């Protein structure tokens, strides 16, 4: 369930979801019960006018996976088990363009590509899975597992100001994107919470889309969207097909 709270210099909100691309059919399996699920997260940030300009993108990317529960649980016979363990959450911290963007993914498709662009007060980022045949393949899962992933995937976002001065660390390879179609699909609550420091962030728009990267299937594709513009919040209205100019993005990983 989406919710938001506006604080002094912070906006706490729930978020939303967007879209991706289309995979090499030659790499995809025709097996009916195999699905290669992907995720595509697109972020558009407009910084406050007084914020210093910083066009250094991809200054650093950090990935950490952790679980909130202790995996060792005492049983009645004094032995230990691994039951009741919360699913791990993978966090990505991206520093660039005068911002630190932190993303948390729980029970979601794997992120394999991270890219960023900056021009003046505009900072854009994209995190996505990668289609088959790109050397970073996601594992195939069953239809039941894919439906559960759509239902359970949760994304959190935390965007803060950054004064990092290190140089950009842009990768030379092209930006890899997922292969999810851009057709109209139903909305799903995928975002947990979004924290935005309004000291440096004026507007925020982002979208998320989850879908099969090999097969177009309406019941295996969902999206969500969120806007925070001039102090007003809108949910589920972001057009992920035109949110940013993807040709300007540079690979961070």
UniProtKB/Swiss-Prot annotation:
The keyword Signal applies. Residues 65-86 have a biased composition (Acidic residues). InterPro entries: Chemkine-bd_vir, Orthopox_35kDa, Pox_vCCI-like_sf. Induction: Expressed in the early phase of the viral replicative cycle. GO terms for cellular component: extracellular region. This is Chemokine-binding protein. Residues 1-17 form the signal peptide. It comes from the Viruses. Residues 62-87 are annotated as: Disordered. The keyword Secreted applies. Belongs to the orthopoxvirus OPG001 family. SUPFAM superfamilies: Soluble secreted chemokine inhibitor, VCCI. Keywords: Early protein, Host-virus interaction, Inhibition of host chemokines by virus, Secreted, Signal, Viral immunoevasion. Binds to host CC chemokines, such as RANTES/CCL5, MIP-1alpha/CCL3, MCP-1/CCL2 and eotaxin. Inhibits host immune defense by binding to host chemokines. Binds host CC chemokines (beta chemokines) such as RANTES with high affinity, but not CXC or C chemokines (alpha and gamma chemokines). It is found in: Secreted.
């Amino acid at each position: 369930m989406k919710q938001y709270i506006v604080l002094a210099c912070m906006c706490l909100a729930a978020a939303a979801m967007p879209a991706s691309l289309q995979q090499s059919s030659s790499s995809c399996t025709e097996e009916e019960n195999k699905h290669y699920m992907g995720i595509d997260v697109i972020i558009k940030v407009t910084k406050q006018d007084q914020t210093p300009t910083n066009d250094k993108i991809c200054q650093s990317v950090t990935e950490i996976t952790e679980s909130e529960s202790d995996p060792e649980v005492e049983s009645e016979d004094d032995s230990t088990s691994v039951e009741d363990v919360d699913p791990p959450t993978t966090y990505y911290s991206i520093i660039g363009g005068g911002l630190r963007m932190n993303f948390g993914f729980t029970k979601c498709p794997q992120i394999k590509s991270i890219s960023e662009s900056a021009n003046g007060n505009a900072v854009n980022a994209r995190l996505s899975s990668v289609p088959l045949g790109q050397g970073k393949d996601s594992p195939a899962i069953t239809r039941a597992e894919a439906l559960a992933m759509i239902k359970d995937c949760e994304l959190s976002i935390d965007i803060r100001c950054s004064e990092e001065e290190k140089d950009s660390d842009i990768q030379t390879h092209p930006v890899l994107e997922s292969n999810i179609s851009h057709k109209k699909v139903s909305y799903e609550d995928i975002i947990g919470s979004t924290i935005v420091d309004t000291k440096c962030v004026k507007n925020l728009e982002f979208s998320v889309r989850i879908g099969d990267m090999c097969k177009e299937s309406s019941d295996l594709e969902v999206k969500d969207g969120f806007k925070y513009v001039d102090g007003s919040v809108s949910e589920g209205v972001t057009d992920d097909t035109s949110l940013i100019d993807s040709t300007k993005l540079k690979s961070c990983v």
